[in-house]
Amino acid sequence: ELKIAGWDFDTNMTAELPVSGMPNNEGTGYVDYVLFGENGLPLAVVEAKKTSVDARVGQNQAKLYADCIEAEHHQRPIIYYTNGYEIYMWDDKEYAPRRVSGFYTQDELQLLIDRRKNKQSLLHVYIDPNIAGREYQLEAIKSVCETFEEGHRKALLVMATGTGKTRTAISIAKVLTEQNWAKNILFLAPTIAIKN
């Protein structure tokens, strides 16, 4: 799986990297895999468990490794834990762990790290009244922003016909891109009339 995503031992990946600061008698540990960026900084840690073990067993150990790596390199890595069948990804400063179908590439991980550093708060954003200016639309947009600020990855708005769902969605997309929370947003139109 790592090779499919472009990770290679000769260029951007290390196995059994020793780290200090672990909460054990020796104070040391060995990270199964560390994935590095082009600048030499660690982008991710991977905790690999046996195929017979639930991958989630490695979550806390992977977090401890990430703590040690961050203390040494001053950059919080993305956390992966896997058993070879299941892969979990965790950006623990941003979101809850989630199951993924594979490992991210070097560019994709770098984008996550960069976005984490560059994104701005959603709590006090300017909402363009030319797009969505009705009071209930503004409240809906603010509610979605607060939900994302709290670390949730999803938000759901239920709005009646004629209330400006499309304008509200466009305004949310604008806020997320302007604040560096999203680069690309897929908007699925439910009818041909909206699409045209």
Tell me the role of every PLM-derived stretch.
Residues 196:
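Short amphipathic alpha-helical segment within the helicase RecA-like ATPase core
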Residues 1-184, 193:
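ATP-dependent helicase/translocase motor core
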